Amino acid sequence: DKIEVQTVAYEMKEDQIGYIAVSEFDSVTYHQFETALEDLEKQGMKGLVIDLRNNPGGNFDTVTDMLKLLLPEGVIVSTKDKEGNVEEVTCDGANEFDKPLAVLVNQYSASASEIFSGAVQDYGIGEIVGMTTYGKGVVQQLMDLGDGTCLKMTIAEYYTPNGRSINGKGVEPDVEVE
């Protein structure tokens, strides 16, 4: 039997504000997030808080797929390798989120959390609340060396929809709260 890790917890708070906490971006996270969003919508959600505090990141495809449930049409994130080759991940805008949105972050929100909060901030569809994020704006790959060890290599840097690099800087909150 496979045990599915719960990476998403959610509830309806007072005043019909939905709350979704995402602990990491795992392969199972997209489906859990989509289910949470749909359930909160059914309950009459008037606004949404997405909590990415202490979320170290995770799967690149998972975070971009989750953002496709929220963002308008356009670029979600782009990556640039050392040769200067740029790849863009785009969104068709079919599910654009049109209610008040806040994304909670702190100094331990990293990598995929920064792709998420950076995109929300660049499109202006929500407020980023908390502390400046970690600043891990690189794509890394593990290379198996065949002897039980592996090498982690940085293969590209990623940029927010407006072309901002997060690496070493992080995403600054719109509203700073400790």
Question: Where are the model-predicted features located?
Answer:
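Cleft-lining beta-strand/loop regions that shape enzyme active-site pockets
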Residues: 1-143
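Short hydrophobic-aromatic micro-motifs
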Residues: 18-20, 151-153, 166
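Metal-dependent DNA phosphodiester-chemistry modules and their immediately adjacent helices/loops
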Residues: 111, 161-166
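Contiguous effector/interaction surfaces
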Residues: 116, 159, 172-173
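Short acidic, Pro/Gly- and aromatic-enriched capping/linker segments at domain boundaries
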Residues: 145-147, 151-156
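Conserved functional hotspot residues or short segments at active or partner-binding sites
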Residues: 165-168, 172-178
